[in-house]
């Protein structure tokens, strides 16, 4: 059963919802476009919580009625039927309680943002670079399934078709909310194409996921930037190495360096490089802020400093294991083609469960 503090909060939200419903029916509000739109937005934000709370109250009433029936009923068959229904209602109540708690959690302000993903080959030489390319294709496939757009910012390919590093933007509603869990060290176990003896090797690649920041969200003083141009080696056809379209930007105070050379024009490369710089600076400032308050758990991941592996792709066993939630799938090919939702959905659920646990530990400590 929900704690009194939570019930009080939900009743407060329901009361406000009813107030808004009443206001939206008034002529003076209907005629005031801005006020009407503002109230519609406020109602939309809390409508799901109110619907879920009303469902909770209905189920609670059903549970109480069934408990009374079990207690009072003389007929054994009817009592047995009521007990079965009671078990079913109890399960539904627990599910709705969890959903209500999850709805009350503060939203991550970056969840709806586009993202910048960076994949870097780790230990394993050429095989690690090939694995980095596999991961890029996996995320490309996932983005396509979601109807999101992918733009390469910069890449450092190898002779065998791998990537020492590839940086790309994923544009689409909720991209950060789904892909933020991919940050960390990914590990592959397989026989490399460069291996003649057939021995299984272990290689790694690091994935970083950063929310794309608007100019107003991350202030950059132009005086803090050193901008250089160079001859691009990107997809420029006859323009390759003939025009200085590549752009390298250094943020002097932080030492962060970003470069982009995949577009034909210097202007496009500069624009993309600035997007990456804003995202990296946001992460840099977040980390500084967390260090100042001695936070033990960094919220921003993907800096390449995390040594623990988050997921292993085992080719001989066709198995993918996410070590954070101790979950394995034996659909390796499907996962690498972009079927990631079975992992992402479980990771989102695990995060919510952890947040709820912490929230109610705090509530318990203050009540």
From Swiss-Prot:
Modification comment: Methylated by PrmC. Methylation increases the termination efficiency of RF1.
Keyword Cytoplasm among UniProt keywords: yes
Localization annotation: Cytoplasm
Record key words, sorted: Cytoplasm, Methylation, Protein biosynthesis
Nucleotide-binding in keyword set: no
Record GO terms (molecular function): translation release factor activity, codon specific
Gene3D superfamilies per UniProt: 3.30.160.20, 3.30.70.1660, 6.10.140.1950
Disulphide linkage map: none
Annotated GO CC locations: cytoplasm
Modified residues (N5-methylglutamine): 238
Pfam family of the protein (one): PCRF
Main location: cytoplasm
InterPro entries, per the entry: PCRF (IPR005139), Pep_chain_release_fac_I (IPR000352), Pep_chain_release_fac_I_sf (IPR045853), Prokaryotic/Mito_RF (IPR050057), RF-1 (IPR004373)
Membrane-crossing segments per the record: none
Described purpose of this protein according to its UniProt entry: Peptide chain release factor 1 directs the termination of translation in response to the peptide chain termination codons UAG and UAA.
Family classification: Belongs to the prokaryotic/mitochondrial release factor family.
Protein name as it appears in the record: Peptide chain release factor 1
Species of provenance: Dictyoglomus turgidum (strain DSM 6724 / Z-1310)
């Amino acid at each position: 059963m929900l704690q009194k503090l939570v019930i009080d909060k939900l009743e407060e939200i329901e009361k406000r919802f009813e107030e808004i419903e009443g206001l939206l029916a008034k002529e003076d509000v209907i005629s005031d476009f801005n006020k009407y739109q503002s109230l519609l937005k406020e109602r939309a934000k809390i409508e799901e919580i109110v619907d879920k709370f009303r469902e909770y109250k209905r189920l609670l009433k059903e549970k109480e009625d069934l408990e009374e029936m079990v207690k009072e009923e003389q007929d054994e068959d009817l009592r047995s039927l009521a007990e079965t229904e009671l078990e079913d209602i109890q399960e539904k109540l627990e599910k709705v309680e969890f959903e209500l708690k999850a709805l009350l959690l503060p939203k991550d302000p970056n969840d709806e943002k586009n993202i910048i993903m960076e994949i870097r080959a780790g230990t394993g030489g050429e095989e690690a670079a090939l694995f980095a390319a596999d991961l890029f294709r996996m995320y490309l496939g996932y983005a396509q399934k979601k109807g999101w757009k992918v733009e390469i910012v910069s890449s450092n390919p190898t002779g065998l078709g791998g990537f020492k590093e590839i940086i790309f933007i994923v544009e689409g509603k909720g991209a950060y909310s789904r892909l933020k869990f991919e940050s960390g060290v990914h590990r592959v176990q397989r026989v490399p194409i460069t291996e003649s003896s057939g021995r299984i090797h272990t290689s790694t690649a690091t994935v970083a996921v950063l929310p794309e920041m608007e100019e107003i969200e991350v202030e950059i003083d132009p005086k803090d930037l050193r901008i250089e141009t160079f001859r691009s080696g990107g997809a420029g056809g006859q323009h390759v190495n003939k025009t200085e379209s590549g752009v390298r930007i250094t943020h002097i105070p932080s030492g962060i360096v970003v470069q982009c050379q995949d577009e034909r024009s210097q202007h496009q490369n500069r624009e993309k490089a600035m997007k990456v710089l804003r995202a990296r600076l946001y992460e840099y400032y977040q980390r500084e802020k967390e260090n100042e308050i001695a936070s033990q758990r960094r919220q921003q991941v993907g800096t390449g400093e995390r040594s623990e592996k988050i997921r292993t792709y085992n080719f001989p066993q066709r198995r993918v294991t996410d070590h954070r939630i101790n979950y394995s799938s034996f659909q390796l090919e499907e996962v690498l083609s972009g079927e990631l939702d079975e992992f992402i959905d479980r990771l989102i659920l695990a995060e919510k469960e952890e947040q709820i646990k912490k929230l109610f530990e705090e509530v318990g400590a203050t009540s």
